[in-house]
Amino acid sequence: MATHSPCIVIGDDEQGYDLDLFCIPKHYADDLEKVYIPHGLIMDRTERLAREIMKGMGGHHIVALCVLKGGYKFFADLLDYIKALNRNSDKSIPMTVDFIRLKSYCNDQSTGDIKVIGGDDLSTLTGKNVLIVEDIIDTGKTMKTLLSLLKQYNPKMVKVASLLVKRTPRSVGYRPDFVGFEVPDKFVVGYALDYNEYFRDLNHICVISETGKQKYKA
């Protein structure tokens, strides 16, 4: 049975933090309920994930595959930490990067209809050790679809790192290999997670308000 690394579990009763305690862009002042995961905590957790990935995949040339658009901030910061470990450790990982773009959301619901709307030729992943970097696992359908797609190209190994995993009754039971935080079934934005393309410019992970949902509804 596959083993998965531990993560920080945020309980259903977590209240988050008052917006006034952090620097929030004024144009989002009425669109958020609270700060859920402060930026500093995201960075500290990402640093530790980099170490776990090095331990689990070290010694192999890795193709790091970023799932756009939401994964780009986590991807960039995670790779920065891996590069720092490469510079300062006896065990280093040769790494190249690639990108794929998927779409499965309209407003705050995962549609279940997964579209690959970007990315290079996936045949380049044949025989490679692949690290998929994702922002959030919601139902798990998107990732299971992507993994099935990649399997057609016969990669040597595939591991998945996701910053967030959502606890939801809609889950198909999929669990990534590396997880930053497990969060309740709330729609979160910020740190490149979007709501119809908005809120990507927010440093912290926050819970969107009903006002925000209505304002930016597709």
From Swiss-Prot:
GO terms for cellular component: chromosome; cytoplasm. The keyword Ribosomal protein does not apply. PANTHER family: HYPOXANTHINE-GUANINE PHOSPHORIBOSYLTRANSFERASE. Gene3D superfamilies: 3.40.50.2020. Pathway: Purine metabolism; IMP biosynthesis via salvage pathway; IMP from hypoxanthine: step 1/1. It is an enzyme of class 2 (transferase). Its main location: cytoplasm. NCBIfam families: HGPRTase. Keywords: Cytoplasm, Glycosyltransferase, Magnesium, Metal-binding, Nucleotide-binding, Purine salvage, Transferase. Its cofactor is Mg(2+). GO terms for molecular function: guanine binding; guanine phosphoribosyltransferase activity; hypoxanthine phosphoribosyltransferase activity; identical protein binding; magnesium ion binding; nucleotide binding; purine nucleobase binding. It catalyses: IMP + diphosphate = hypoxanthine + 5-phospho-alpha-D-ribose 1-diphosphate; GMP + diphosphate = guanine + 5-phospho-alpha-D-ribose 1-diphosphate. Mg(2+) binds at residue 194. Its EC number is 2.4.2.8. The keyword Manganese does not apply. It is found in: Cytoplasm. GMP binds at residues 69, 134-142, 166, 186-188, 194. It comes from Gallus gallus (Chicken). InterPro entries: HGPRT, Hxn_phspho_trans, PRibTrfase_dom, PRTase-like. Pfam families: Pribosyltran. This is Hypoxanthine-guanine phosphoribosyltransferase. GO terms for biological process: GMP catabolic process; guanine salvage; hypoxanthine metabolic process; hypoxanthine salvage; IMP metabolic process; IMP salvage; positive regulation of dopamine metabolic process; purine nucleotide biosynthetic process. Homotetramer. Belongs to the purine/pyrimidine phosphoribosyltransferase family. Converts guanine to guanosine monophosphate, and hypoxanthine to inosine monophosphate. Transfers the 5-phosphoribosyl group from 5-phosphoribosylpyrophosphate onto the purine. Plays a central role in the generation of purine nucleotides through the purine salvage pathway.
